[in-house]
């Protein structure tokens, strides 16, 4: 009893049972109280470890006896979270603790060393990343959380955790460049690769951490510096999905925006990267699996069908890992990404796959049952054969139904293969299978045992062990002659087998069987050691072995692969002996062959011909130096073939396909550069286009199409794949009434008819299919189709149709949903107003979240709607509001407008889709029911609303209000903003830059209310709406004449640039700016005191984000950006023309070009939405003499221009060395370039570089270290409003919000701050500097102890010195400064802090600090308690007390804007003087 208790205290019960029969194995059983996990062998030893609940146990005798691992001073007991072995060092292992202490061994578990870290470990996954060459180099991924905000720091060690350092404070996965021994075996590496680390980081300003980038560092990200990996032809790539090491390759996957397509990038030296080509096939999200690969190629399973029955195609790369060839179609796969593919261990070129024979049925009906058959290849996938058991076909369960640890079919035992399956037409269920064996690497098979069994190999195949796997058993089976005959051995206990394993190299005669006994509440677990050492009495001699060929060809002769035949020394099946060479891996004998066609692959710049027999140039070949003076010349170049690296075939007497051959210099010729703009005019027999949409190809795609879909007013559909050079009619006679592009996937377009039939393309018009819905389109002007925002759920649809609308019935709208692209539909909700998928995002964690508006009482005549949501297709539902007008879903917020009584509205917001909070509108804001609001934007961590305050037709205007970061508390940003009858607002945010927006305000509000026409003025913000100013006009017009007014440094009400905006556009897609042309905007307007008629306007451009504007053309033009702003085309909007103007230098010079001999009235000019193409499309009608009827399109192709024929060069490590420079946007009122608390630095093409940008790439180079906070980083808080001097004051008669609310809203809150009238702009990341949003902290109720701990005060002598010494010092310094200062003491305006100037300037700390402290002595007695806490907080703000630096990562792609992680710097002068004491000079007023 005492012994049992002692064992229980160690959480392990030991009981031994032994058998000693000579004709069977020796069996030892250890009983466990808890199920063991993480069992592993130290390679080439009998030492085994496992985890037992919260303890680690070790055995040094192959599992016969076990002892707890105690660690130094027995500290490990009861503290183990997980155990891991080092995959490349047989002596190392790691025990990770539940807290901050962990242990490591480097002597196979004999001794353990303890190390402690400051961070916690992630909840799941292996946090360790290993170096493939130096086993002392390890990366440890950790996590740090503060409230609901978590970051993931990474640590690294170069001495096996004898010491460790912070690698980076925020990452999404880091790995050594040399991550495998195969990669480390490369003979030569670029410099510094040995220490190179690659990490995934949150993208720069990625709103909710969705986009990630890949950076590398050779100095462990010293100084928070890293370089973005140049994946795409030397350029970085956004939105990285994953990065892994595969044998001798590094593989990174990236996602293209607005599509489900992925791109795969491969490197074999961690320096040069190439995009993988998949033989015309496309990769999709969660659509590929890196399979077991070789040292000379990568195998990838690419998903070819989705749904619940996925299938994959097998692709094999060349030796560079770049060019992939399709080997097999319709491989069986599962939803976890596993593919039924496995190589035979130790033998090159042989692998088994499972394929689906009824794949057409599965693709058509996703819920069908697969018919799976097994195939085997003996020649690296070139051909596949049936697996034969006698004369019948054998089918085996593979990776998708794995039932044991380790490999499925084979082990290092040469040629021995086992599997569970059945003979017949297709694979049956696992429990209907039997155990089959092959001893010739899969050529022939036989049934070894009835029923399904787990199995394992020992002594290089001399012993095969199996255990029943369909239920409980008390025996094992084993074979000593390659599985032809079997014996059984009784187990002392009856178990359900869980794992059967042995040493990784299968050279041992000892096995471990893990199983579970009977019962559920008191279930026992067992580790059973099986030892076959005594079954045979003798060790094998020379005559017991054979020279066994690993591969045979169709003539059953030894076959060649990679230039050699492969043989093994293997024990004969009938020999009654054991090899007994423990831990000595079987070594193949290689016999070289003469070279054949199979030993060669296509050389770089070459691809396989269509018949797969030759290698042809993939692109124009490089010109050999000193050759090819004339096109008709000849030169000696590559044959197109090369010997596969690593292939050791004998060339003498064999094929020499890589022998250089004579080529024509015409192969090197590039596409001719005509030097002219190409023009293609196409006419249509229709009056006008009804609608047209670009289906832009994915950014990372290798496709070249530029697809546009067009629906004419005659309801005819046309498609172009070459940007309008040619058009073809599609879906003729199908009665298409509406084009409906997929909101989140550019590859998908729906063609809606007036009935139930819908047509669809999923590949930008390459093919079409049709499906039927349950109902025809609705009649309530509701969106017919709604899409899921997740690219992986692109087939999830909501269709809103009309029901019971015939003959005056109860006509209403019904929503149906489909998860398979429209094949099957299910009712979602009846009597709906509108339904939308919300999906994951931010704190929303489910894909099934749907919101619907539904008529109250399910009565379509009832115009009151309620808002409901569900996470299970409305099997269960939640009612959020009972009387709403409408709702909107956005990236971070869900916004709803609901009635609050008879004559007012209320707005609710949610970030999690579950809990809504009513918005707190600014004071004096009473939104009447008959008035309106417009959701403007939610991309900068806040919601922008326009609330109409005057709603008379043609006289509408309102106020823009902006929310806090959770969308609930709104402050007034700007009043009297223009709106039109259709509820559109003159508001536009600049694309590509943070926080810049333009609006038009009504200048004559009083007159407009009385019925007068509006007079509009344009205003701009550079800090996300916290401050607005009039736009500063240019000094001269396009003809070089001065304007009639000159405002000075900034625009004024009397003299500003006023621009025609959103409410006047024909097409709302025609914006001022472009996301790819950073800093550029074009607009039409005029200089003066208000906006005049558009017909009287001129055309203007800005190149610096709206600070300086230039008049470029007299008159009203429409414009379009091309090649990311390196080409801009303008054309007259209001008059017929034959010409366009274009600029190649951002509007500094303009060139006129005649594109037609017949005048045309142009209605629009377009290009691809990303503005990256060199092609443009004019839409218009011919007028005047020679005009043709109907409308026409004109393609303008600028790719023939010499100035745009060469691709620009960008090197991330030297960004200004070639065709680009670094540009920093700035605020016009600041002397430095800090915006939103940081300096953003962008790549921009040099205007004089004669080249083209090409595909879209990330313009943001990096974000520098965070800046000190200034007034521009704050906006007015709730119930406060901005004054004329830029300060924030409480609205008369109102009170601040109760600051204690945070204590109830956040249970983890320790303190709250006294309201100051200011709050941080949600977008800012500033640190230190001016702190305006919280001077004085108070403890939350019942959190006094925590508050004191966080803010320890000064007492006694310390307090005395803290007061007296600064005053004395300040007096001395103040006297000296006063006599030398350039001015008198005056008022300091709030927040007008300069970051530069002399020591004696007004903002010098030598002046400001003494002023603050001397002034503070006046109130020192009343401020004593406050000062004590203030001194501590100030000290903590300047010195890193109790925490590391909070500076986020500053290099490109790694900047994680940790909003909410701010250092609380208290400015003593602010706290003592109060905000009202700050003022400034007249020339510094805001």
UniProtKB/Swiss-Prot annotation:
Residues 1-20 form the signal peptide. Gene3D superfamilies: 2.10.70.80, 3.30.60.270, YVTN repeat-like/Quinoprotein amine dehydrogenase (2.130.10.10). It comes from the Eukaryota. Glycans are attached at residues 295, 966, 1262. The keyword Transmembrane applies. Residues 21-1356, 1427-1486 are lumenal. It holds the Pfam family Sortilin_C. InterPro entries: Sortilin_C, Sortilin_N, VPS10, VPS10-sortilin, WD40/YVTN_repeat-like_dom_sf. One of its GO terms (biological process) is Golgi to vacuole transport. GO terms for cellular component: cytosol; Golgi apparatus; membrane. BNR repeats lie at residues 57-66, 376-385, 436-445, 478-487, 718-728, 817-826, 1100-1110, 1141-1150. The chain crosses the membrane at residues 1357-1377, 1406-1426. SMART domains: VPS10. Residues 1378-1405 are cytoplasmic. It is found in: Golgi apparatus, trans-Golgi network membrane; Prevacuolar compartment membrane. It is a multi-pass membrane protein. Its main location: Golgi. Keywords: Glycoprotein, Golgi apparatus, Membrane, Protein transport, Receptor, Repeat, Signal, Transmembrane, Transmembrane helix, Transport. Belongs to the VPS10-related sortilin family. Functions as a sorting receptor in the Golgi compartment required for the intracellular sorting and delivery of soluble vacuolar proteins, like carboxypeptidase Y (CPY) and proteinase A. Executes multiple rounds of sorting by cycling between the late Golgi and a prevacuolar endosome-like compartment. This is Vacuolar protein sorting/targeting protein 10. The lineage of its organism: Eukaryota, Fungi, Dikarya, Ascomycota, Pezizomycotina. The gene is VPS10.
């Amino acid at each position: 009893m005492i012994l049992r208790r002692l064992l229980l205290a160690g959480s392990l019960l030991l009981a031994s049972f032994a058998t000693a029969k000579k004709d069977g194995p020796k069996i030892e059983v250890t009983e466990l109280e808890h199920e063991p996990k993480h069992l592993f062998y130290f390679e080439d030893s009998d030492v085994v470890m496992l985890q037992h609940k919260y303890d680690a146990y070790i055995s040094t005798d192959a599992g016969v006896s076990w002892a707890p691992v105690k660690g130094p001073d027995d500290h490990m007991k009861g503290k183990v979270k997980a155990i891991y072995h080092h995959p490349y060092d047989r002596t190392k292992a790691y025990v990770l603790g539940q807290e901050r202490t962990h242990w490591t061994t480097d002597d196979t578990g004999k001794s353990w060393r303890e190390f402690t870290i400051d961070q916690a470990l992630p909840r799941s996954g292996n946090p360790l990343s290993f170096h493939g060459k130096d086993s002392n180099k390890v990366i440890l991924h950790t996590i740090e959380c503060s409230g609901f905000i978590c970051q993931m720091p990474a640590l690294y060690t170069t001495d096996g955790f004898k010491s460790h350092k912070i690698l980076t404070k925020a990452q999404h996965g880091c790995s050594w460049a040399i991550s495998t021994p195969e990669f480390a075996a490369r003979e030569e590496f670029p410099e510094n690769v040995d220490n190179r680390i690659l990490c995934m980081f949150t993208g720069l300003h990625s709103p909710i951490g969705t986009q990630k980038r890949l950076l590398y560092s050779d100095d462990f990200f010293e100084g928070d510096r890293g370089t973005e990996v140049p994946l795409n032809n030397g350029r970085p790539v956004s939105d990285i999905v994953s990065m892994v090491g595969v044998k001798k390759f590094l593989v990174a996957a990236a996602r293209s925006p607005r599509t489900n397509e992925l791109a795969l990038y491969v490197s074999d030296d961690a320096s040069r990267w190439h995009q993988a080509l998949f033989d015309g096939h496309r990769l999709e999200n969660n659509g590929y699996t890196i399979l077991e690969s070789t040292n000379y190629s990568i195998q990838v399973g690419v998903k070819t069908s989705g749904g619940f029955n996925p299938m994959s195609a097998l692709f094999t790369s060349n030796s560079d890992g770049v060019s992939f060839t399709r080997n097999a179609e319709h491989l069986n796969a599962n939803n976890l990404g596993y593919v039924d593919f496995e190589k035979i261990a130790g033998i090159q070129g042989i692998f088994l796959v499972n394929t689906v024979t009824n794949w057409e049925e599965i693709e058509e009906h996703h819920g069908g049952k697969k018919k799976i058959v097994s195939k085997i290849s003996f020649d690296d996938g070139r051909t596949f054969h049936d697996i034969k058991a006698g004369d019948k076909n054998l089918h085996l369960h593979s990776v998708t139904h794995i039932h044991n640890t380790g490999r499925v079919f084979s082990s290092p035992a040469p040629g021995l293969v086992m599997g569970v399956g059945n003979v017949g037409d297709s694979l049956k269920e696992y429990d209907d299978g039997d155990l089959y064996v092959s001893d010739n690497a899969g050529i022939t098979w036989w049934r070894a045992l009835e029923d399904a069994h787990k199995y394992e190999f020992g002594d290089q195949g001399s012993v095969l062990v199996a255990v029943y796997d369909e239920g409980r058993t008390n025996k094992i089976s084993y074979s000593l002659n390659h599985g032809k005959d079997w014996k059984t051995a009784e187990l002392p206990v009856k178990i359900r087998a869980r794992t059967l394993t042995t040493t990784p190299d299968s050279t041992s005669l000892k096995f471990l069987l893990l199983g579970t006994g009977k019962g559920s509440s008191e279930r026992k677990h067992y580790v059973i050691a099986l030892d076959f050492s005594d079954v045979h009495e003798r060790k094998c001699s020379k005559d017991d072995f054979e020279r066994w060929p690993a591969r045979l060809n169709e003539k059953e002769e030894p076959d060649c692969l990679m230039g050699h035949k492969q043989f093994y020394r293997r024990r004969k099946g009938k020999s009654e002996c054991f090899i007994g060479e423990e831990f000595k891996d079987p070594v193949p004998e290689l016999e070289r062959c003469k070279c054949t066609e199979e030993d060669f692959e296509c050389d770089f710049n070459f691809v396989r011909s269509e018949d797969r027999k030759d290698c042809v140039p993939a692109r124009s070949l490089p010109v050999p130096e000193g050759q090819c003076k004339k096109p008709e010349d000849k030169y000696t170049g590559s044959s197109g073939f090369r010997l596969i690296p690593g292939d050791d075939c004998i060339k003498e007497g064999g094929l020499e396909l890589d022998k250089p051959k004579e080529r024509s210099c015409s192969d090197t010729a590039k596409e001719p550069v005509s030097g002219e703009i190409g023009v293609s005019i196409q006419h249509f027999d229709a009056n006008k286009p009804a609608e047209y949409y670009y289906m832009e190809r994915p950014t990372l795609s290798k496709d070249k199409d530029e697809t546009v879909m067009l629906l004419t007013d005659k309801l005819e559909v046309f498609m172009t794949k070459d940007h309008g050079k040619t058009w073809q009619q599609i879906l003729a006679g199908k009665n298409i009434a509406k084009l409906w592009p997929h909101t989140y996937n550019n590859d998908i377009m729906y063609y809606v008819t007036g009935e139930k039939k819908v047509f669809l393309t999923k590949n930008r018009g390459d093919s079409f299919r049709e499906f039927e819905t349950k109902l025809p389109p609705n009649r309530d002007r509701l969106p017919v189709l709604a899409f899921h925002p997740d690219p992986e759920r692109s087939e999830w649809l909501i269709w809103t149709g009309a029901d019971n609308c015939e003959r005056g019935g109860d006509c209403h709208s019904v929503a149906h949903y489909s998860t398979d692209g429209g094949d099957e539909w299910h009712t979602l909700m009846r009597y709906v107003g509108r339904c939308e998928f919300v999906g994951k995002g931010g704190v929303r964690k489910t894909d099934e979240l749907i919101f619907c508006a539904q008529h109250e009482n399910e009565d379509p005549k009832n115009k009151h709607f309620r808002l409901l949501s569900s996470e299970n297709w409305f099997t269960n539902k939640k009612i959020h509001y009972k009387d709403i007008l409408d709702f909107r879903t956005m990236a971070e917020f869900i916004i709803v407008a609901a009635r609050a009584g008879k004559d007012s509205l209320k707005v609710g917001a949610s970030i999690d889709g579950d809990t809504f909070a009513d918005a707190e509108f600014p004071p004096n804001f009473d939104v009447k029911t008959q008035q309106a609001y417009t959701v403007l934007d939610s991309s900068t961590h806040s919601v922008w609303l326009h609330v109409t305050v005057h709603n008379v037709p043609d006289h509408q205007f309102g106020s823009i209000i902006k929310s806090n970061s959770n969308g609930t508390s709104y402050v007034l940003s700007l009043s009297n903003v223009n709106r039109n009858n259709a509820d559109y607002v003159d508001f536009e945010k600049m694309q590509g830059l943070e926080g810049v927006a333009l609006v038009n305000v009504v200048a004559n509000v009083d007159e407009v209310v009385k019925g007068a026409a509006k007079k509009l003025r344009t205003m701009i913000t550079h800090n996300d709406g916290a401050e607005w100013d009039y736009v500063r006009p240019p000094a001269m017009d396009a003809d070089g004449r001065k304007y009639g007014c000159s405002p000075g440094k900034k625009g004024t009400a009397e003299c500003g640039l006023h621009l025609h905006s959103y409410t006047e556009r024909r097409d709302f897609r025609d914006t001022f700016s472009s996301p790819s042309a950073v800093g550029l905007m074009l607009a039409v307007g005029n200089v003066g005191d208000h906006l005049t008629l558009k017909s009287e306007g001129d055309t203007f451009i800005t190149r610096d984000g709206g600070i300086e504007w230039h008049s470029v053309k007299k008159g009203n033009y429409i414009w379009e950006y091309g090649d990311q702003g390196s080409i801009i085309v303008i054309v007259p909007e209001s008059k017929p023309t034959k010409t366009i103007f274009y600029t190649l230098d951002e509007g500094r010079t303009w060139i006129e070009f005649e594109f037609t001999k017949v005048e045309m009235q142009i209605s629009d000019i377009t290009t691809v939405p990303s503005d990256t193409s060199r092609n443009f499309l004019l839409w218009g009608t011919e007028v005047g003499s020679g005009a043709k009827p109907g409308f026409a399109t004109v393609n303008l192709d600028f790719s023939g221009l010499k100035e745009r024929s060469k691709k620009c060069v960008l090197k991330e490590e030297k960004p200004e060395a070639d065709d680009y420079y670094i540009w920093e946007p700035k605020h016009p009122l600041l002397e430095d370039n800090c915006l939103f608390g940081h300096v953003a630095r962008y790549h921009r093409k040099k205007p004089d570089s004669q080249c083209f940008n090409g595909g879209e790439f990330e313009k943001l180079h990096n974000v520098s270290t965070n800046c000190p906070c200034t007034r521009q980083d704050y906006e007015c808080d709730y119930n406060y409003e901005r004054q004329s001097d830029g300060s924030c004051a409480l609205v008369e008669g109102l009170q601040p919000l109760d600051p204690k609310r945070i204590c109830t809203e956040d249970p983890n809150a320790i303190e709250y701050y006294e309201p100051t009238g200011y709050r941080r702009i949600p977008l800012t990341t500033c640190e230190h500097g001016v702190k305006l949003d919280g001077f004085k902290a108070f403890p939350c109720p019942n959190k006094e102890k925590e508050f004191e701990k966080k803010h320890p005060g000064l007492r006694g002598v310390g307090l005395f010195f803290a007061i007296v010494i600064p005053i004395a010092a300040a007096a001395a310094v103040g006297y000296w400064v006063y006599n030398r200062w350039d001015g008198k003491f005056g008022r300091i305006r709030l927040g007008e802090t300069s970051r530069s100037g002399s020591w004696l300037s007004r903002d010098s700390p030598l002046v400001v600090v003494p002023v603050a402290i001397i002034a503070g002595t006046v109130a020192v007695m009343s401020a004593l308690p406050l000062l004590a806490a203030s001194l501590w907080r100030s000290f903590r703000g300047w010195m890193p007390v109790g925490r590391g630096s909070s500076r986020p990562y500053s290099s490109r792609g790694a900047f994680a804007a940790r909003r909410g992680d701010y250092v609380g710097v208290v400015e003593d002068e602010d706290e003592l003087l109060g905000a009202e004491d700050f003022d400034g000079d007249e020339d510094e007023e805001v």
